[in-house]
Amino acid sequence: MNREEFLRLAAEGYNRIPLARETLADFDTPLSIYLKLADQPNSYLLESVQGGEKWGRYSIIGLPCRTVMRVHGHHVSVTHDGVEIESLDVEDPLDFVETFKARYNVPTIAGLPRFNGGLVGYFGYDCVRYVEKRLANCPNPDPLGVPDILLMVSDAVVVFDNLAGKMHAIVLVDPAQQDAYARGVAQLDELMHKLRQPITPRRGLDLDRAPRADPVFRSSFTQGDYEAAVDTIKQYILAGDVMQVVPSQRMSIDFKAAPIDLYRALRCFNPTPYMYFFNFGDFHVVGSSPEVLVRVEDNLITVRPIAGTRPRGATEEADLALEEDLLSDHKEIAEHLMLIDLGRNDVGRVSEIGTVKLTEKMVIERYSNVMHIVSNVTGQLKNGLTAMDALRAILPAGTLSGAPKIRAMEIIDELEPVKRGVYGGAVGYMAWNGNMDTAIAIRTAVIKNGELHVQAGGGIVADSVPVLEWEETLNKRRAMVGSAWWPWPRRLPRVEQACCSGNER
């Protein structure tokens, strides 16, 4: 874009204008670019692997963000360069987010990637309390104390095009600033200079190192307490109070490694459709989620329910046998069909009548440690609604709550010993152009104050077996735990004790 085009867009009323530069990406990876440009607080890296086997087309590297929004309960704090510029209590923080996003008027520029800036971060599980008044107050303690919503204004990004072997460096420029165009060009020049610099070497992750002593996790449940919670849920189901509930347990362990090294191990051992690394300064969120929460692209809503799990086999023949066993398991099929219906209902709440479609039904997707049954539901967003309306309708996913959703979440509040926080919420972005792409925050670690916290759960139905449900939570944490301790252990850390068991509440 030349200066005349920039000034024309400014005259049309746009208050942020993207300037971009394209270059070959044959000497770099998304991770190396992140380490060169963005390895500081309030930065991020988003990557994708399709079908567990093929890297998605775009990876997004978010340079350190100057403006950050944090929401605790109903209190909103906005900082710029670390200085608080807004502090207020609001009735509905989701409304505030939408109003805040509307402050940025950004043109669509032909030839740029579909994401070139927006609000990036997460909406925690407890955001449902802004929507459902029956759930307005969380009764459980919050030992992590992270924000319910944390969104960064991402106005400088590098988008890595894995298909074309190119990358786009993009900066959003405020045309009201003095010499705005020249300053934007200078910022791009500086980015390109940094891209040409060698990467600072990091320690290797040696696959052949000898194992260390077994580490021990601290769990929010003992095995007995978790199995008792499953039995309680089954009683609710038999009484006709609910059809399914998805309880979870949090597991915590001391963690002294660099969080980026956990991400390096995850992208090697457990590549998924949603890989993410967030450095929020006082804590990190690192994840490899297999499941979209909700995607809105050109007003097409997509949700992709995942329910039904088996561990991976050692051979192709073993995998096929496990797939057959999974697809013939009446409990798993019943659970999945229930969640398809819930997904249709959620999408239908914000879709034009007659547009909701089941485009894939009960296909198997394989990941590094487990395989899942997956379906795909789409709908056309109603005229006049926005991506935030879709998020309101769908968060949290039925796969993380149950059915009927509100009653299931009341039971979760009753039985789980701690506030969920990031777990079960939405991780991703809301782009300036109205699109949104969010993953369910599962297979996700929160690293804070020298501890790593990971949470896992499973859907409980009438014929669930408590000990098997406990084992399913351990299988689901396997990729994260193995990566956190890679390459040292050849067996997983033990879960030894409850740090806040249900019996102590």
From Swiss-Prot:
The biological processes this protein is annotated with in GO are: L-tryptophan biosynthetic process
Tell me what reaction this enzyme catalyses. chorismate + L-glutamine = anthranilate + pyruvate + L-glutamate + H(+)
Documented activity regulation: Feedback inhibited by tryptophan.
Top-rank lineage group of the source organism:
Bacteria
Query: How does the cofactor attach, per the note?
Result: Binds 1 Mg(2+) ion per subunit.
Q: Which residues bind chorismate?
A: G308, T309, Y423, R443, G457, G458, G459
Locate the residues binding Mg(2+). E335, E472
**One Pfam match:** Anth_synt_I_N
Q: What pathway does the UniProt record associate with this protein?
A: Amino-acid biosynthesis; L-tryptophan biosynthesis; L-tryptophan from chorismate: step 1/5
For whether the record's keyword set contains Amino-acid biosynthesis, the answer is yes
Q: Which cofactor does it need?
A: Mg(2+)
Subunit info here reads:
Heterotetramer consisting of two non-identical subunits: a beta subunit (TrpG) and a large alpha subunit (TrpE).
Q: What is this protein called?
A: Anthranilate synthase component 1
According to its UniProt entry, this protein's organism is Pseudomonas savastanoi (Pseudomonas syringae pv. savastanoi)
